[in-house]
Every structure is written in C-alpha cells, then in structure tokens.
Amino acid sequence: IVRCCSATCKXSCVCCF
C-alpha cells in the first residue's frame, strides 16, 4: 500500500487526509 498526500489521491493508495 502506498501513501498518497496529493489532492487527487486515488487508486491503490491511502490518503494522508
């Protein structure tokens, strides 16, 4: 699992917010 912190967080990742 990858951690995405961008506003367009999607796909196989977990948002930081």
Curated annotation (Swiss-Prot):
Its main location: secreted. The keyword NADP does not apply. Keywords: Disulfide bond, Secreted, Toxin. The keyword NADP does not apply. Coiled coil: none annotated. One of its GO terms (cellular component) is extracellular region. Expressed by the venom duct. GO terms for molecular function: toxin activity. It comes from the Eukaryota. Signal peptide: none annotated. Disulfide bonds join 4-15, 5-13, 9-16. It is found in: Secreted. Belongs to the conotoxin M superfamily. The cysteine framework is III (CC-C-C-CC). This is Conotoxin reg3m. It comes from Conus regius (Crown cone).
